[in-house]
Design a protein with these regions (language model features):
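Specific register positions within alpha-helical solenoid repeats of the TPR/Sel1-like families, i.e.
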Residues: 30, 64, 68-71, 109, ...
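"A position-specific structural signal for the A-helix of alpha-solenoid helical repeats
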Residues: 24, 58, 62-65, 103, ...
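N-terminal leader/linker segments that initiate helical-solenoid repeat arrays
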Residues: 20-68
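Conserved small/polar residues in nucleotide/adenosyl-binding loops
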Residues: 159-160
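Helix-turn-helix repeat elements of alpha-solenoid scaffolds
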Residues: 29-41, 76-85, 121-125
């Protein structure tokens, strides 16, 4: 799975068109899973380029992994919500970008994990719809299929 993330971040490095060396350094750190070290530089870039979906996507990914690695539950929730806020902004700017949609599904799923059962069920329909669209757009991306597998598993755990 880590190899996939490294390849994903290398993909970002190849297709990014802004901020030259700064962005290259950030992508190198992301590919090395150094999320704490990229948070501040990304936030600085975001303040310069608030409408850049590539920066927002990277901020979302960074906060998602900070959430996943958090020891404190409050840090987990705070970073999960930030990840979702950033990806929502990116989605508003570039709603047809399959990588943004993929991370939208991931961060949405994370934010509803502790929600009410009713909301989990309602959001599971949204998650499935978007995940299927991502699979259609990125049919060779194995991570998309993993997302669907996780969705089915988490849905099976919901107790009414």
């Amino acid at each position: 799975m880590i190899i996939f993330y490294k390849n994903l971040f290398k993909f970002f490095a190849l297709f990014s068109l802004i901020v030259g060396q700064e962005f290259k350094d950030i992508d190198t750190k992301l590919s090395n899973l150094e999320f704490e070290q990229v948070q501040l530089p990304l936030e600085q870039l975001h303040s310069k380029y608030p409408e850049n979906s590539d920066i927002l996507l990277r901020l979302s990914i960074t906060h998602h992994y900070l959430s996943e690695s958090a020891i404190e539950e409050s840090e987990d929730k705070k970073n999960a919500l930030k990840a979702f806020e950033y990806i929502e902004q990116a989605n508003d700017i570039d709603p047809d970008n399959p990588n943004i949609l993929k991370w939208y599904v991931i961060t949405l799923g994370k934010t509803v994990e502790e929600d009410t059962i009713r909301n989990q069920i309602e959001q599971s329909k949204n998650i499935q719809k978007i995940a299927l669209k991502v699979i259609e757009l990125l049919p060779n991306d194995e991570f998309c299929y993993s997302i669907m597998g996780q969705w089915h598993y988490k849905l099976s755990l919901i107790h009414i």
